[in-house]
Amino acid sequence: MKTKAFISLIFLSILICCKSEKEKIFEKSIVGEWNFDKFIILKKENNPEEPPPLPFMAKNGYIFHSDKTCIFKPGFVSMIEGKSREENQILYLGNSTKYKIKNDSLKIQNLETNKWNNYKIVSITSDTMTLQKTEDELLKYYKTNYVINPNENYDKIIVSSSGCYGTCAIFDLLISKNDNSLFFGERYNSKNGIFSAKISKDLFKEIENSFKKSNITKLKNRYSSNWTDLNEISVTFIKDNKIIKTVSDYGGEAPDEFRMSYLRTNYLYQTLDLQNKKEILPFQSIGQVSKSNKLIYFEKSEIFYLFYLLLNGKELPAKKISTIYTLKGFGKNDEETEIKSDGRFFVFNNRLIDIGFNFFELNDFTNRNLD
């Protein structure tokens, strides 16, 4: 009897030891950066011709650290329903959370539900991680190894959201490495209005590097879904006052790394110390720009950059200028202000603002390639 108990104890010890070794292998292998690759459906649906669509937020990614913390790249959000659709809000909860591995189980703390999401680890290799989410569904991730160009640097990054047929946030956010940042919340934000804020150089660098992982200069100018009434995000990168690159993404069709970067930035304003910006202009947006009665096309983030320059320009005594461009500014109640400009000086309501350089010549909007 004692011999049997002794053998059972040895066998149990071996099992525990094996499990510990398995955990150690998984704990070591999981460290690094992983992006979502695809779903694998184990059991066919009744209608295999109609595979389930990939949820927008399913295209995610994680950065697992050895200290049992991880980054959920898009960040966790919570929907707060108001009394009316206008009062609905999305609150950003952060992107840093905890994880733990027990045997072949991976648990990730969900900041929205305050519960642990549970996955079975099917395998982790040097470049692929396969997790089982449900009995019928596997999630496959690929390991990333980004080489970030240290010589690619920007002074400002602008993210703008156009809204959709629903409650998608409408906003513009300009973050600056050296100057004050600017946020304009128009609708469906937890704060609406025009605000200034400061961000640290470390935070700017973190956001910049996140975007740089998508190889900014190699991205197309526009990505578009065939569906209607979706949200459009535009992102503009500025260096030495010049627009280096603008990428527009309608319906979340841009590469995953780029999309995850702007999703996180969409709610950055909720983490900043926003200060009400004094309204020194009779308009809070620019809706139209023309040259010789011909409209010039701008992405939303680009036109917000011009608004930012006007807001921070130097006001001079009014004088006559050679009018080359005509702009229309719009106030809170859509009241219209006509603005005349030669590219550097902007005249409206007997006021003159100097932005310090010729905005249109520097960026050559009339010869731009929109493809």
Regions from the PLM with identified roles:
Residues 1-30, 34:
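Bacterial Sec-dependent N-terminal signal peptides
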Residues 22-32, 36, 101-103, 108-165, ...:
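Short, well-ordered, aromatic-rich surface patches in folded extracellular/luminal domains
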Residues 36-42, 71-78, 160:
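Generic short beta-strand segments
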Residues 38-68, 166-177, 295-299:
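Short, solvent-exposed loop/hinge segments that bridge or flank secondary-structure elements
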Residues 51-101, 178-190, 194-201, 301-317:
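N-terminal glycine/threonine-rich, aromatic-flanked beta-hairpin/loop signature
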Residues 55-59, 92-94, 114-117, 166-172, ...:
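Short, surface-exposed coil-to-beta transition loops
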Residues 199-231:
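Short, internal acidic amphipathic alpha-helical interface segments
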